């Protein structure tokens, strides 16, 4: 999770978001945020440009995702 925080602190980069935890039993708010990011089930991956709105969404669901920087 610490690596996720370092990546979120950067600006104007592309990040790959990987869903590693299930949506079952999670708060409805977190489920909606993950679906807005395009992550519906475990193992889904999406690439997003890291701006302020995406940063807020990633911070909301930081414990359920893994981030990696895409060149």
Curated annotation (Swiss-Prot):
For this UniProt record, the keywords arranged alphabetically read as follows:
Ribonucleoprotein, Ribosomal protein
The GO molecular function terms of this record are: structural constituent of ribosome
Q: Which domain of life, per UniProt?
A: Bacteria
Signal peptide, first to last residue:
none
Biological process terms from the Gene Ontology for this record are: translation
Q: Which GO terms describe its cellular component?
A: large ribosomal subunit
Q: Which InterPro entries match?
A: Ribo_uL30_ferredoxin-like_sf, Ribosomal_uL30_bac-type, Ribosomal_uL30_ferredoxin-like
> Assembly and interactions?
Part of the 50S ribosomal subunit.
What does the sequence similarity comment in the record state about its family?
Belongs to the universal ribosomal protein uL30 family.
- Name listed for the protein in its UniProt record: Large ribosomal subunit protein uL30
Upper taxonomic classification of the species? Bacteria, Pseudomonadati, Spirochaetota, Spirochaetia, Spirochaetales
Gene encoding this chain?
Answer: rpmD
């Amino acid at each position: 999770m610490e690596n996720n925080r370092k990546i979120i602190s950067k600006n104007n980069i592309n990040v790959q978001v990987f869903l590693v935890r299930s949506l079952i039993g999670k708060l409805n708010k977190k489920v909606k945020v993950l679906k807005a990011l395009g992550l519906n089930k475990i193992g889904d991956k999406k690439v997003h440009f890291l701006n302020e709105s995406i940063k807020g969404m990633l911070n909301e669901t930081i414990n359920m995702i893994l981030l990696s920087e895409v060149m």
